[in-house]
Amino acid sequence: MFTIITYFGLLLAALALAVVLFVGLSKIELI
């Protein structure tokens, strides 16, 4: 159970990081 929660949290963190990088690149291109 703990392993599944840890894996889900890691996946969520990776997704959040991808969104932040995508938004950052978009803002750089807009400038």
From Swiss-Prot:
Subcellular location: Plastid, Chloroplast thylakoid membrane
Domain of life: Eukaryota
Predominant location: plastid
Protein name from the UniProt record: Cytochrome b6-f complex subunit 6
GO BP of this protein: photosynthesis
Species assigned in the record: Zygnema circumcarinatum (Green alga)
Taxonomic lineage of the native organism: Eukaryota, Viridiplantae, Streptophyta, Zygnematophyceae, Zygnematophycidae
Transmembrane portions of the chain: 4-24
Membrane topology designation: Single-pass membrane protein
GO molecular function, a single term: electron transporter, transferring electrons within cytochrome b6/f complex of photosystem II activity
Disulfide bonds: none
UniProt GO cellular component terms: chloroplast thylakoid membrane; cytochrome b6f complex
Subunit structure: The 4 large subunits of the cytochrome b6-f complex are cytochrome b6, subunit IV (17 kDa polypeptide, PetD), cytochrome f and the Rieske protein, while the 4 small subunits are PetG, PetL, PetM and PetN. The complex functions as a dimer.
InterPro entries in the cross-refs: Cyt_b6/f_cplx_su6 (IPR007802)
Free-text function comment from the UniProt entry: Component of the cytochrome b6-f complex, which mediates electron transfer between photosystem II (PSII) and photosystem I (PSI), cyclic electron flow around PSI, and state transitions. PetL is important for photoautotrophic growth as well as for electron transfer efficiency and stability of the cytochrome b6-f complex.
Keywords noted in UniProt: Chloroplast, Electron transport, Membrane, Photosynthesis, Plastid, Thylakoid, Transmembrane, Transmembrane helix, Transport
Family affiliation: Belongs to the PetL family.
